[in-house]
Amino acid sequence: MKVILATHNQGKIREFQKRFSEIGWEVIPISDIADIPEPEETGTTFREMCIRDSFRENALQKARYYAEAVNLPVLSDDSGIIADVLGNEPGVYSARYAGVHGNDEANNQKLVEVLHPYRGEARRGHYMCVIAVVWPDGREITAEGRCNGIIRDFYKGTGGFGYDPLFYLPEFGKTMAELSMEEKNKISHRGKAVDAMLKKLKEAGI
């Protein structure tokens, strides 16, 4: 089955293609299909809705938009990092925390600066991911995943993307960026969301 992936993020493309190939899905980036303007993400802020619903709203919005545009099933996700002490920032704004969408270096540096006054338990946070699959006939399935850790004030590791070099996993003694893709897919927020989605798809007979 062919499914369109609503992202231009190369890291996400690699992760989704690897995992969904397990059920025979051919995951094709939207950029390989058509030059379609990206939808504006209008997920409500955390102060107005719970974290999960904000991510879910954005994931569904993207998937619905592209499913209508290309008339094919679309896979989308919305994810981000949450620093508990900051009142759930960066959250749905993770990819553009420093003002420019997709600038990992700038986003990481801003988070380091904002968290600079905090130490120890105050630096706890988590990654959150919500995945959505939307079909042109209106069917929709969503799944979520979460990964807890500590947001460090220095970088370590060269793998992954986003905030992975800052996100330390005490149980592994590594940052997310130090994990292999196989390790990351087992324990990351996105890996857990994919696991939940694959289970739901199987239960639905898809």
Which residue ranges define each predicted feature?
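Anionic-ligand binding patches
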Residues: 2-4, 10-206
